[in-house]
């Protein structure tokens, strides 16, 4: 009877195990059928998330590049502003330079009573020019060079056998540039060939 009971218990345990295994496998199938659509949805969401992250990363990179470009342009504009802030000031100083040069050109240097005044004007002009040259001002005063409409303004032409046509013969009024930018063109007389 003990053997029978043991045998019955084994059979009962075995059939209980089989029933549990069947139930588990049915549950697993149900879970699989439940999980599968959710897995697909999870995968789709992960793909969308990756795309959004990539788009966001690209947007951030683009914005960083745009910010760097704006900063670079601002720095360049500030440099230009510093470089050419003196433009108007230099334009106002040019008539003073012209007047000092004209004075030295017409004054009688042989008059000994004026020698101290002449020397004072000469030193003043030299000091004044040295000062403006320190700030990037350059004079345009070369003669016997080809006429350049970017830096010269022809006010007259003169026939010449000695110089080629379109050569600068005389500077009537010096021109000036500030850091490579023209402030005032040089007023010149240009050679033309004899007809």
Swiss-Prot record:
Cross-referenced InterPro entries: GrpE (IPR000740), GrpE_coiled_coil (IPR013805), GrpE_head (IPR009012)
Record-linked PROSITE patterns: GRPE
Highest taxon above the source species: Bacteria
Database matches in SUPFAM superfamilies: Coiled-coil domain of nucleotide exchange factor GrpE, Head domain of nucleotide exchange factor GrpE
MF terms (GO), sorted A to Z: adenyl-nucleotide exchange factor activity; protein homodimerization activity; protein-folding chaperone binding; unfolded protein binding
GO terms under cellular component: cytosol
Protein's UniProt keywords contain Chaperone: yes
Example GO BP: protein folding
Subcellular location(s) per record: Cytoplasm
Subunit text: Homodimer.
Protein known as: Protein GrpE
Organism expressing this protein natively: Blochmanniella floridana
């Amino acid at each position: 009877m003990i053997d029978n009971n043991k045998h019955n218990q084994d059979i009962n345990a075995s059939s209980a195990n089989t029933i549990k295994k069947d139930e588990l496998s049915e549950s697993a199938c149900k879970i699989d059928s439940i999980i599968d659509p959710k897995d697909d949805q999870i995968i789709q969401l992960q793909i969308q998330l990756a795309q959004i992250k990539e788009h966001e990363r690209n947007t951030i990179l683009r914005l960083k590049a745009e910010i760097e470009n704006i900063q670079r342009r601002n720095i360049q504009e500030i440099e230009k502003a510093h470089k050419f802030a003196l433009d108007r000031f230099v334009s106002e100083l040019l008539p003073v330079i012209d007047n000092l040069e004209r004075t030295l050109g017409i004054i009688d240097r042989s008059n000994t009573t004026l020698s101290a005044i002449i020397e004072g004007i000469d030193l003043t002009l030299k000091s004044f020019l040295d000062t403006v040259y320190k700030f990037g001002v350059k004079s345009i005063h070369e003669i016997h060079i080809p006429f350049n409409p970017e830096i010269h303004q022809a006010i007259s032409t003169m026939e010449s056998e000695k110089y080629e046509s379109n050569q600068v013969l005389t500077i009537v009024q010096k021109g000036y540039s500030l850091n490579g930018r023209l402030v005032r063109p040089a007023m010149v007389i240009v050679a033309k060939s004899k007809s």
